[in-house]
Amino acid sequence: MSPAAAAAGAGERRRPIASVRDGRGRGCGGPARAVLLGLSLVGLLLYLVPAAAALAWLTVGATAAWWGLSREPRGSRPLSSFVRKARHRRPLSSFVRKARHRRTLFASPLAKSTANGNLLEPRTLLEGPDPAELLLMGSYLGKPGPPQPAAAPEGQDLRDRPGRRPPARPAPRSPPPRSPPPRSPPPSPPTHRAHHVYPSLPTPLLRPSRRPSPRDCGTLPNRFVITPRRRYPIHQAQYSCLGVLPTVCWNGYHKKAVLSPRNSRMVCSPVTVRIAPPDRRFSRSAIPEQIISSTLSSPSSNAPDPCAKETVLSALKEKEKKRTVEEEDQIFLDGQENKRRRHDSSGSGHSAFEPLVANGVPASFVPKPGSLKRGLNSQSSDDHLNKRSRSSSMSSLTGAYASGIPSSSRNAITSSYSSTRGISQLWKRNGPSSSPFSSPASSRSQTPERPAKKIREEELCHHSSSSTPLAADRESQGEKAADTTPRKKQNSNSQSTPGSSGQRKRKVQLLPSRRGEQLTLPPPPQLGYSITAEDLDLEKKASLQWFNQALEDKSDAASNSVTETPPITQPSFTFTLPAAAPASPPTSLLAPSTNPLLESLKKMQTPPSLPPCPESAGAATTEALSPPKTPSLLPPLGLSQSGPPGLLPSPSFDSKPPTTLLGLIPAPSMVPATDTKAPPTLQAETATKPQATSAPSPAPKQSFLFGTQNTSPSSPAAPAASSAPPMFKPIFTAPPKSEKEGPTPPGPSVTATAPSSSSLPTTTSTTAPTFQPVFSSMGPPASVPLPAPFFKQTTTPATAPTTTAPLFTGLASATSAVAPITSASPSTDSASKPAFGFGINSVSSSSVSTTTSTATAASQPFLFGAPQASAASFTPAMGSIFQFGKPPALPTTTTVTTFSQSLHTAVPTATSSSAADFSGFGSTLATSAPATSSQPTLTFSNTSTPTFNIPFGSSAKSPLPSYPGANPQPAFGAAEGQPPGAAKPALAPSFGSSFTFGNSAAPAAAPTPAPPSMIKVVPAYVPTPIHPIFGGATHSAFGLKATASAFGAPASSQPAFGGSTAVFFGAATSSGFGATTQTASSGSSSSVFGSTTPSPFTFGGSAAPAGSGSFGINVATPGSSTTTGAFSFGAGQSGSTATSTPFAGGLGQNALGTTGQSTPFAFNVSSTTESKPVFGGTATPTFGLNTPAPGVGTSGSSLSFGASSAPAQGFVGVAPFGSAALSFSIGAGSKTPGARQRLQARRQHTRKK
């Protein structure tokens, strides 16, 4: 009765109101009827609709009633004769009004009495259920028509009972005590009206009430029914992708319902078909298929006939039209996928269809199964491909089947073939394959493809761990393609071929099984996959070849190293390419180190199984690349290799650009030998290379898609000029500052200001960051170094100057010499300035040659992730990458942040540079002065001071607004980039420093050398102040640590979200999403959430060396492993010591030395070392973190979401996308780069199509 009570409450208002309107009813029958209808509807709603709906209706009714009352009194007054009677009610109505004020006391009784007054007996009879009264009122009142009038007198008697004695008198009597007459008169008209109305109302009430009730009932049920129906089709479509359809089909009434809709939907046939294929895919998944085959076989035979005929005919026609195209695609895909499956169970799959197949080539295939299959494939293949690529979950097996199944589901299977055969056959295939995922053929083409691919790749890795796995995998793929292509052609041409067509048919048979309710599983995935797999393999091969050729040509021109580079490009991931991995072992870069790295990169790219191949993991991570192999080189930086580094870089540039999809550019830098400071290795390399760098400079040039700019090299001689290349500027923005000459590179931005400013020629190094893969960037190696890192950009620094390129934008701006963006003082060059890119990293170098800057510069970039920074010697840092990008950071000290982060370098000298870049969102870089000055630059520590920026706020003082950032070009964040001289970094990016999201920091230069830069930086971030808001010491919460950048801000600057140091959530140093970490020495910074320093926040950070954080955590101080806690989702691993936790937090900081590990948070933690992947990543920690490699490298990054794997070696952290270690992929657990590449390839393919 609560509804009844509610109704009664409503009744108080409405019924008196109704009565009023009833009075009106006579005056105005329409309004009264409307009111009555409304009441009846309300009653129905009370019964039919949930309380919420009832309340809504009541409110509507009440509003209408009040509106009516406001009008009614006027009309009602004329009815004086009834007013007396109504006066009875008036008190009641007045009561009702009063009761409304104090409904608790009178509401229900008054409502009833008022209702009684209005309806009298009917109500008294119906009083029990007020809602019932409302509903029944209309019917009873209407039906009893005459009785109601009688009832009215009775009602009067009843009224008299309460106040009948003088009907008129009681009204006055009762009104004065109960309510003032003024109220009563209006109420009376309602009551009075109600009496009159009832006689007239009965019919209206009956009609409206009856009508509304059926309407409500009908409409509601109809709507509900409709909704489910809609949902079913929708689910089916979804299922088509997911393979859930079978249930939907069941809901939709299995085959018939589903098929019939398909038949009716022939227009939408692709959709329908798609639905079936996904189910098959699932059915392909071993168990479901088997079960389905048995369960669905009988139903499948039923539904297929009608569908098969009509749908088959239409499908056949369409398919015949599309066959030529699809068959070609299918030939490849089927050959690859079905090849193995066929071999597994070629005969069984065809048994049902073979006769049809025997009829002829695909055309003869026309028998319902074949042609329809293709037709469906042709229709839905594109969609399927898209869906499949999106939902990698589809089993590759299904991919092969999917193309065949859809038509078969409609036609051949449904019409002529028993579902059991198809299912069992599919089954067999799967069984032999070992499960959709494991089947080798399927692995390529379908989701299972990933696991299968991993298996194959693992095999490849094992077979040729030293040789580039990519090449092997590709070769195997090529062989498969060659083998499969003919078979596919045969199959598509004549499905008589038991292998391909049979399997498809089997797939179709799955459709019959689908009738069993799982028919839906296979189709879409298969369709999508068949094309996708083919595209992946063929496109990859073609693109890789093309890249290789381009790279080879360029690299040949540039140098021997090119050969290696091309391979690097080879892997072109969609997002990233490792610039580094060269296909050929040729060392031209540091041969030994490079080769292994390159190989490992290839392996990473190719074989998902990084874990199996440590090299691959190491290589995979770009950072890993260089660092692991040649720690000294800082390969991370660019892999710089000594080798003719000059050449290498150029090749690398050349090669890279091609590689990167987006393209990165490397700017060549020239560092004169001066580099010195760079880590010795760097120095040596740089020294050797400077010339080389200059040479490369021309090479780089190429710009990339996105605009990367290419840089032009300046004359090698003039180091400053060299800077050239600014790298890509960030897409969004970045202007780079070009500062002095910066020749603008043709590339979009110029960044490079050529670092002219930098005083040292050395610094000039400019590296351009490359843009590197879309998502990931590579840093260009600065001058010398070849950009090795896979993803990372490395920057190279040759000298400090290097800039790194940002990922996205690469901008890397920093050139060393200020160049890129900022420069800081010449020596400092902090260049850093990350570009926005998504992240850029910048790096600045400090004057110190070491600067790590170089290293740092190295790269950062990741798209999302930054590359690592390299440290000079430290290469290790590199490591982590975040997927989203973290830059890795830097060598030693530095760590990278995840999201972006920059990292700083640790070395004192080095200190400065780090640049982390945001990579993902922002980058930063930090620079530092040499050691100190930087103060803080990064350091995290640093303190201090003062303020911390506001989180979002900008950081640093620099006045510049962020965007405008004076210099800063970065789009999002500015980088600081100032001319070297410029003091102010202008950083202030909006978010704070530079980066928008993250900022970069300005680098500080070495203090001496560039006080200005330092100064700049300082403001930018330096200000030491960086505290994180959340907490970190240094940084500001959102990061503003100076250093850190928000999302990615570089360390120095605060990041928007995360300060550099701090992380968004807190990483200490690291930047928001990614935190970087920070730096070395001091180390600690706190993290927001706490990670120690480093932790990056979010998404992933890398760790600095040490810890990682999950989300972003990382940590990292070098020395200590700081733990950093990770925050977020994923933890990165921490470096060695530290552990970080994912969410966790921990802590904080530790000083350098301390390890402090952080505690883990919750989300997932990974342990440091451990690699367990959360999602499966390899080592990856939960979300993917990966662990770092041991060694300093540890820092390796982790990825937040994705898993990454552990880095392969050493440090290397991870590569952003492809990187080995970790890859980002949000969803993915750790994926091996190989898997990632496949996904990317699919995506690309889908896009292309």
From Swiss-Prot:
Provide the membrane topology annotation.
Single-pass membrane protein
Query: Which stretches are tagged as biased composition: Polar residues?
Result: 405-423, 491-502, 683-696
Keywords per UniProt: Endoplasmic reticulum, Membrane, mRNA transport, Nuclear pore complex, Nucleus, Phosphoprotein, Protein transport, Repeat, Translocation, Transmembrane, Transmembrane helix, Transport
Residue ranges of the region described as Pore side: 56-1249
Q: Where is this region: Disordered?
A: 1-27, 136-220, 319-530, 602-776, 959-986, 1226-1249
Keyword Transport annotated: yes
- Record's Gene Ontology CC terms? endoplasmic reticulum membrane; nuclear envelope; nuclear membrane; nuclear pore; nucleoplasm
Give the Low complexity compositional bias ranges: 1-10, 432-445, 635-652, 712-726, 749-770
What domain of life does the UniProt record list for this protein's source? Eukaryota
Please give the InterPro entries that the UniProt record associates with this protein: Nucleoporin
Positions of the UniProt region annotated as Required for targeting to the nucleus and nuclear pore complex: 1-285
From the UniProt entry, list the residue stretches annotated as the region Cisternal side.
Answer: 1-34
Entry GO MF terms: nuclear localization sequence binding; structural constituent of nuclear pore
Coiled coil feature spans:
none
Signal peptide (from-to) = none
- Residues annotated as transmembrane: 35-55
Is this entry keyworded Transport?
A: yes
**Annotated positions of the Phosphoserine modification:** 94, 345, 351, 371, 393, 396
| Pfam families (UniProt xref) | POM121
Q: Where is the composition biased (Basic residues)?
A: 1239-1249
Instruction: Return the Basic and acidic residues bias intervals.
Output: 11-25, 450-462, 472-486
The compartments listed are: Nucleus, Nuclear pore complex; Nucleus membrane; Endoplasmic reticulum membrane
What does this protein's UniProt record list under function?
Essential component of the nuclear pore complex (NPC). The repeat-containing domain may be involved in anchoring components of the pore complex to the pore membrane. When overexpressed in cells induces the formation of cytoplasmic annulate lamellae (AL).
Query: Member of which family?
Result: Belongs to the POM121 family.
Q: What is known of its domains?
A: Contains F-X-F-G repeats.
Protein name in the entry: Nuclear envelope pore membrane protein POM 121
Q: Which organism is it from?
A: Homo sapiens
